[in-house]
């Protein structure tokens, strides 16, 4: 569960290391975001020669949460931390590589690119 002020790791090669959620998109009173949800983030820590700079604001999709996601068969997929992938205005990934596993829940038409770039799909 990601809410405003939550810090997330970045699971792509854009140069951002850490981001902070500044808004959960999808409704005026929406408080939490889970895996597959789009959020607005600001870059808090970035690599010196990366594509993004500290303070930049981007959309991002949540790809891993410590809270996890419940499957229809009753199983629960959890991760050690929270991670997101930065998106451009067309909701396409900015980076060309994805680090770490992602879940099958991202397998919608919007995020097939992220699933295909990921080294492991759980």
From Swiss-Prot:
GO terms for biological process: translation. Gene3D superfamilies: Ribosomal protein L14. GO terms for cellular component: cytosolic large ribosomal subunit. CDD domains: Ribosomal_uL14 (cd00337). One of its GO terms (molecular function) is structural constituent of ribosome. Keywords: Ribonucleoprotein, Ribosomal protein, RNA-binding, rRNA-binding. InterPro entries: Ribosomal_uL14 (IPR000218), Ribosomal_uL14_bac-type (IPR005745), Ribosomal_uL14_CS (IPR019972), Ribosomal_uL14_sf (IPR036853). It comes from the Bacteria. SUPFAM superfamilies: Ribosomal protein L14. Part of the 50S ribosomal subunit. Forms a cluster with proteins L3 and L19. In the 70S ribosome, L14 and L19 interact and together make contacts with the 16S rRNA in bridges B5 and B8. HAMAP family: Ribosomal_uL14. Belongs to the universal ribosomal protein uL14 family. NCBIfam families: rplN_bact. Binds to 23S rRNA. Forms part of two intersubunit bridges in the 70S ribosome. This is Large ribosomal subunit protein uL14. It comes from Aromatoleum aromaticum (strain DSM 19018 / LMG 30748 / EbN1) (Azoarcus sp. (strain EbN1)).
